[in-house]
Every structure is written in structure tokens, then in C-alpha cells.
Amino acid sequence: MKAFVASGLLLLIFGMWRCSGIEPVSMECDYFTFRVIAKRALFYPDDLIGPDELLLGASCPVTSIRPDELEFYYDIHSCGTFIQHAFDGTIVNTWLTYMPRNISIYAELQLQCVIPRISQDELDNKQSSDECVGESESIDVGNLDFHPPPQCWFLVLKRYCIICGHFHFPNNWLIPYHGWKDESFQRLWPSLFHR
């Protein structure tokens, strides 16, 4: 009965969060680092999440705490991130793990950050003939204007159910989560997923 009440409470919290219109989590990435910023009022406006309740991946703690936000700033290859290379860009997959203090269940928020690939045509169009550097001129590498392109982020909520031992999506809690679309992504707990 307690598990049923707790799962209903999480469903209510996730429903309120999705309908609030607030951007609760944002993710920025480039080819070397990524940053995730989560609102401390992630699920309910009056209930702030503590830094010990939210982890990046399975075990990476918060790197910066502000009154209204928790920030994670890590190397692109840490915290269990999975990198996919596509023809039009690079996709960085990671997740936030929310483990509340007083409840024995936890939730995972999957995140994706897309780094679009810049084509050679786009690079050629940025440099005009009067910007070319002659042989006698030197280039100050510190002043090169190279910024990572704008990123996109996607948020997929899922819940781990202690009763059945599977992950579920919030739009239909009865359908279990069957893992990432790319089966080469190996998690720390592969036995928890349906195969």
C-alpha cells in the first residue's frame, strides 16, 4: 500500500512539473565539457531539493550550489555519459538521479544534448577575402572566435518501480522502460532493464 501511495505521489509531482511551463533542467555541452543546471524547486515550488538528493549519472555530486539552482559541471567522458555520433552532429546522453531522503524510491531524468556539426560551407562563408591573413602576420590564438554552436536539450522522465523492479515512463506508468534506443549503452545496473 505504501508503494502505491508513493508512486501516486510521484505521478502527481511529475504531472505538476510538466504542466508548470518552467524550464526545470537545462544542459549545455561542447566536445570537452558539459553543464547541467537543475532548479532546486524541481518538482514543487515550495519544496527545494537538497544537493545530496540529486546526482548526475549514478554518483557524480553537485559541483555548484546557488539558492535556486544546482549545477553539475563535468568532463564529457565522466559520470556515465554516453556519446553518439550522427551525420549531422554529436549527441551526449546522461541522466539525473533524484533520491529523496524520506522515500525509498528514486526517479531518473534522462537528458540529451545535441552538438550540431558545422559544415565546410558554413566555415567558408564566415571568412571573406579581406579577412585572410598574410604570411608576415601572426595569429593570436587566444582571440580566435570559436564558440560551440547552440545546443538542444531534451528531457525524458522515467520512474523506477521497486514493486516490479522496472523503469516506467510518466505518460503511461504501466508500460515499462526498455532501455536506450542504442543498446551499446551499458549502464551500471544492466539487470534492472527489461531485455
UniProtKB/Swiss-Prot annotation:
The keyword Chloroplast does not apply. Gene3D superfamilies: Zona pellucida, ZP-N domain (2.60.40.3210). Glycans are attached at N102. It is found in: Secreted. It comes from the Eukaryota. Oocyte-specific. Keywords: Glycoprotein, Secreted, Signal. The keyword Ribonucleoprotein does not apply. Residues 1-21 form the signal peptide. One of its GO terms (cellular component) is extracellular region. InterPro entries: PLAC1_fam. Belongs to the PLAC1 family. This is Oocyte-secreted protein 3. It comes from Mus musculus.
